[in-house]
Amino acid sequence: MTQDEMKKAAGWAALEYVEVGSIVGVGTGSTVNHFIDALATMKDDIKGAVSSSVASTEKLKELGIEVFDCNDVAGLDVYVDGADEINGLNEMIKGGGAALTREKIVAAISDKFICIVDNTKQVDILGEFPLPVEVIPMARSYVARELVKLGGDPAYREGVVTDNGNMILDVHNMKITNAKELEDKINALPGVVTVGLFAHRGADVLLVGAPDGVKKFV
């Protein structure tokens, strides 16, 4: 299996968690795009989706799936999204696609978080993938200095504006041994919208596309 074939396998495997008549939370990224393709095969059996990004919204609509505003739903049964890294506790780094804030919001209103990845995303310790932090533009330099104090090496992601109109700092050289504590510390910095650590709201189910098929971790 190629890496993309493993992503596709994980994306299609998530379809079993979608309930008939439901509104489905949909994340962002290359693996999620495969899930959206799968979801389109049962578009007549679901009410629609809540999307975490403009890109996913466009793809959902192109495939004929109705997209609801997050503010118009009280909650979701399931949220399906990928990850840039995920550890053995199902804690994740997300935000490589700059949609981390909206992803956190949709995850927060969902009863179950299904994470879909290929096997290259599984790690023992989070941090080799740069940790994204969404910041309000005027706070960029201040937040960067504070991230250095926390042991990181932040870099401004050039040319990227989030769907919320903000900037991304990617924090390199972090070995994250206490993800919940670091999530709290970074989120407490004035000017931070959110950090791409999904530790307090980790995945409930992990579906991993591997050369020998899809593996499930709970």
From Swiss-Prot:
Mind listing the UniProt keywords for this protein, alphabetically? Isomerase
Q: Which reaction does it catalyse?
A: aldehydo-D-ribose 5-phosphate = D-ribulose 5-phosphate
Q: Which gene underlies this protein?
A: rpiA
- Asked whether the keyword Isomerase is assigned, the reply is yes
Q: What is the lineage of its organism?
A: Bacteria, Pseudomonadati, Pseudomonadota, Gammaproteobacteria, Vibrionales
Q: What class of enzyme is it?
A: isomerase
| Isomerase recorded as keyword | yes
Query: At the top level of its lineage, which domain of life is listed?
Result: Bacteria
Pfam families, alphabetically? Rib_5-P_isom_A
Q: In which pathway does it act?
A: Carbohydrate degradation; pentose phosphate pathway; D-ribose 5-phosphate from D-ribulose 5-phosphate (non-oxidative stage): step 1/1
Q: Which GO terms describe its cellular component?
A: cytosol
Q: Which PANTHER family match?
A: RIBOSE-5-PHOSPHATE ISOMERASE
Tell me the protein's name: Ribose-5-phosphate isomerase A
Entry's Gene Ontology molecular function annotations: ribose-5-phosphate isomerase activity
